[in-house]
Amino acid sequence: MQLLEGHIQHYAWGSHDVIARMTERAAPTTEPEAELWLGAHEAAPSRLLGDGAQGHLDALVAADPQRVLGDLAARFGGRLPFLLKVLAPVQALSIQAHPSAAEAASAPAGTYGDGWAKPEAWYALTDFEVFAGLRPFDDTRALAELLDVEALTGHVAAATAASEPARALLATLLHLSADEQADLADAVVEACRPLAPAEPALDAVVRIAEQHPRDIGLVVLLTMRHVVLRPGDYAFVDAGVLHAGVRGVVVEILANSDNVVRAGLTPKHIDVDELLRIADLDRQIEPERGVLDEGWTCFPASTPYFRLRTATLAPDTLPVPGEDQPRILFALDAPVEVVGSGATVRVAPGQGCFLEAGEQAYVRAVAPDGAVSDAPRPRVFLAAPGEA
């Protein structure tokens, strides 16, 4: 077992207090803190903590993948297949889609950093506002008519005759000149303003326009479903699904990859052709609740890369499942102890504990002085490989 310190990503859209408070540091922070990564991705691997510990989790895995990963070493090329994050946006993220493994492997050289798919899933810690998946095209057409922006209704009408109207409309919007995109975004936002108080999706577009003025992504958002995940909701986001987080706090579990293509709300390059190639415009996200199994709330994912479980700890000990697999346990709200064969690791809120394949362990709540306690009751999240 190894105590882990997550890596904080200071993206501009992040909160100045959420992750700091979660990890028991002073807030507000000078820099924004957007994401906390727990895993072995080479871009931001977790640091190993504890007596005699040195280095980072990626190096630990690479030194002996067969021991650390067990039977998964060959299947995933010696890489830990999952990555666990906390996302804390106070501004909208870019509109994104991620490739399947086949799409990543067949893309032109340099498009992606690796040949992996990048499905992901969110567990909401607070209300989490997001745009994800597309509206039915008839709904997009009705919304365009309601907004009555001539350029937009013209683009929608032209796309209607296509075999895939939604894809045709997306292609049209993203292939407009920069000036045409900016003018259309301005006109659409102004048309949204009087309707925004009664329409949450339009209200979100108006708010996001303050963060990303004149961005074509504001128009793309109108073609997407507006969803608010409630605390405890879980949503699986498969490869190809367009999505953009807006605000809130989630635990995110994903394949151990950073492959991404963007569709707006970003100053970064938009690879329109690749986006149109990989975007799955029919698939949606469906918020769900997990199933209780031996003290853990378990969430399914139709992917071999990851599976998420969570539990709120009582005074009793709770066995950590999946002993034949590598796992990361993440603590929130109060410290916990992970007890293994001959070793005990104390995990503070915001820290993680890595368990190698073959390691048996259980977890229990502890008071700051080490005594077993039932208040406050910590929450733990367990990231493990999937079973698909």
Predicted feature locations:
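Conserved short histidine dyad/triad with adjacent acidic residue
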Residues: 304-323, 358
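C-terminal, non-catalytic macromolecule-binding modules
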Residues: 249-298
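Short acidic-glycine-tyrosine-enriched beta hairpin
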Residues: 224-237, 241-245, 340-361
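A short beta-strand-loop-beta hairpin characteristic of the jelly-roll/cupin
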Residues: 62, 66-70, 214-230, 321-322, ...
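Active-site cores enriched in adjacent His and Asp/Glu residues with nearby glycine-rich loops
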Residues: 179-221
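Transition-metal
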Residues: 1-197, 267, 272-285, 308
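Short beta-strand/loop turn elements enriched in aromatics
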Residues: 193-210, 297-300, 315-325
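A short hydrophobic beta-strand segment most commonly corresponding to one strand
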Residues: 93-96, 119-130, 248-267, 306, ...
